[in-house]
């Protein structure tokens, strides 16, 4: 039985969306137990009774505008912190939150702890693509500044996840750069390219450009945290803007536009589903001693359900235990 700690109070739509997503997951997966951390009265308004769910009451929560590290240190009873603490104490196997990203990263690093040998855990998400085959990308903002060694390690981490969780036998790893030639990029990218070219444990295919990553250029895309976060936000904004513009054109285009949309409704639905990030789950702070996963702040119940599904897969495949052994065979997860 997998025990998953869930911060019920984090995110724009908490606790309703969080709890409803938990209800769906409990109905679907019989091998999980959920610990919900937060305001018990508010949680019960949406919770379906189930013997595999428990509530740990707390009135304290971390707000979106709280300074991350300070919040973790001062708000010891916050729902997010208690969930991370449960993982540290082995009362839970993983923790999920849709709350303050920086605070969850801090809780992951300072409470759950990183695997020995991992210099900088990276924030990694499985992203949709136009081909229908998702790709993993990291770092998406856990670290604003990185060295070439960090990028080298991100490539190993991302390849490991793609292979062991997503089932890709030989993941193609690409380095995000401003051109595909090996001479492209600044000193960071050039140094990272040399390191990745010599790394025998991964299938490094060279540099990839931002315009290529949504078209299946690589299974794993490696970037420094600042660049990765900027690209992520650009992809999200472009997707939302495209759908909004398309909807506006249909609604304001008269009868012909509406008729065309009706005839294309199945195609349009398929397009929307292809670009739906929620079905891929949350962003994993990969390189820690247990799964710490961030849902999007605006997550609905569907996104929460898929994040729990993702964490369940991580626990089923024992990817963290395998990662510990890969980086330091003598260390045990604690």
Curated annotation (Swiss-Prot):
Transmembrane region positions?
Answer: none
**Localization:** Cytoplasm
For the protein in the UniProt heading, the enzyme class is transferase
The EC designation for this entry is 2.3.1.274
The record's listing under Gene3D superfamilies reads:
Isopropylmalate Dehydrogenase
Q: What's an example GO BP annotation here?
A: phospholipid biosynthetic process
Pathway(s): Lipid metabolism; phospholipid metabolism
Listed GO cellular component terms? Answer: cytoplasm
Pfam families xrefs: FA_synthesis (PF02504)
Q: Which InterPro entries match?
A: FA_synthesis, Phospholipid_synth_PlsX-like
Substrates-to-products reaction catalysed: a fatty acyl-[ACP] + phosphate = an acyl phosphate + holo-[ACP]
The organism sits in which domain of life? Answer: Bacteria
Identify the keywords attached in UniProt to this record, alphabetized: Cytoplasm, Lipid biosynthesis, Lipid metabolism, Phospholipid biosynthesis, Phospholipid metabolism, Transferase
GO MF, any single term: phosphate:acyl-[acyl carrier protein] acyltransferase activity
Q: Which family does it belong to?
A: Belongs to the PlsX family.
Q: What does this protein do?
A: Catalyzes the reversible formation of acyl-phosphate (acyl-PO(4)) from acyl-[acyl-carrier-protein] (acyl-ACP). This enzyme utilizes acyl-ACP as fatty acyl donor, but not acyl-CoA.
Subunit? Homodimer. Probably interacts with PlsY.
What HAMAP family would the database entry show?
Answer: PlsX (MF_00019)
NCBIfam families annotated for this entry? Answer: plsX
Q: What is this protein called?
A: Phosphate acyltransferase
Q: Which organism is it from?
A: Streptococcus thermophilus (strain ATCC BAA-491 / LMD-9)
Classification lineage: Bacteria, Bacillati, Bacillota, Bacilli, Lactobacillales
